[in-house]
Amino acid sequence: MSERLKNRHVLLTGAGGGIGLAVAEACMAEGARCSVIDRATAAPDAVRALQQSHPDKLAYIAADVTDTQAIAHMLAEAQVAFGPVHTLFNNAAVFDLAPLLDSDEASFDRLFAVNVKGMFFVMQAVLRHMVEAGTQGASVINMASQAGRRGEALVSHYCATKAAVISYTQSAALAMAPHGIRVNGIAPGVVDTPMWDHVDSLFAKAEGLPPGEKKRRVGLEVPLGRMGLPSDIAGAAVFLASDEARYITAQTLNVDGGNVMS
């Protein structure tokens, strides 16, 4: 590897598995130290395995991103582990089906609490830290989705939350530009992760499909002919965190095999 992130500290939320953990692994391969954040009290098995192979590069911190006090404690612990944060990979999110006429307040509140409130207040806390620390080459990467680019009948709340991520990314980028801090987003398409296994089970129930059928169909519908892999997203994240992207800000990069054109 080229060590594009050598000696940098990357803080990743929603990184107990799937895309978040794949990004952490890719960042460490490029020389970064990673604070891996997830809501589980104990580090998931996959995190522990990665920590054993990179004992000096990975710290696991349990935190609920919907709790602003927990966010403050998380950030303090991360600094104790590895010093000032250079990059935030803001990935924590939840998914649920929300048919427009049947959706209830609880589903609405849950998705917006994690996907919007949590995303914003984690970003705000880390940006304040970056400004105060005067961190050189600092950047934020917010995880959006192709669902934030267009409405979908069965996932209205999720689409709205991810559209909010794109909007906050643009606003934050303009606010932080005078400080030399870049803020970008990534909008994945359909990515083969445990979260998508959950999505598949929800659609199986809603549409009367056998398990795995929704995943099979959406993969075939992608112009490149397959679902994405966490490593596909990780490559984009490393690029955006690196100096190679030093003149890129306020953008949300589609990494979706051609599903969305912009």
Go through the PLM ranges and name each one.
Residues 16-17:
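Conserved glycine-rich cofactor-binding loop
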Residues 99-100, 107-112, 218-219:
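Substrate-binding pocket helix/loop in short-chain dehydrogenase/reductase
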Residues 123, 161, 169:
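Active-site helix of classical SDR
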Residues 128, 174-175, 246:
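Alpha-helical segment proximal to the catalytic Tyr-Lys
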Residues 145:
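Residue(s) in the substrate-gating loop at a strand-loop-helix junction
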Residues 150, 237-238, 249-262:
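Short C-terminal tail/terminal secondary-structure segment
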Residues 177, 182, 248-250:
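Short, small/polar-rich loop/turn modules that mediate ligand/substrate recognition or access, typified
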